[in-house]
């Protein structure tokens, strides 16, 4: 029984789910916005916010944690250079989820998640 479990399962095993969230986080930070299902967008939101908060901290240990999570080391350096001035006046809420039309093949709820 999964009482009070906060992580959405996304229909995948734990290792596949973690890899999916890592790749979605990496691509969202790289491109600024991605189109995915609404459930995946809600799941990746917390991971992206965690990475941006680490980048705002800017310490060496925070940089190493981000390098261990994101797939692109150069992207981490760019994030740590950009995030402190871009999000200096925000304490959270770095992303926005906008609902779009349902996917044609399976009628899944789609959304665009973007960085503010």
Swiss-Prot record:
Domain of life: Bacteria
A Gene Ontology biological process term: translation
A UniProt-annotated Pfam family: Ribosomal_L17
Tagged with keyword Ribonucleoprotein: yes
The entry's keywords: Ribonucleoprotein, Ribosomal protein
Disulfide bond sites: none
GO terms of molecular function: structural constituent of ribosome
PROSITE patterns, per database record: RIBOSOMAL_L17 (PS01167)
GO cellular component, one term: cytosolic large ribosomal subunit
Protein family according to the UniProt entry: Belongs to the bacterial ribosomal protein bL17 family.
Subunit comment: Part of the 50S ribosomal subunit. Contacts protein L32.
PANTHER family in alphabetical order: LARGE RIBOSOMAL SUBUNIT PROTEIN BL17M (PTHR14413:SF16), RIBOSOMAL PROTEIN L17 (PTHR14413)
Protein name: Large ribosomal subunit protein bL17
Organism encoding this protein: Crocosphaera subtropica (strain ATCC 51142 / BH68)
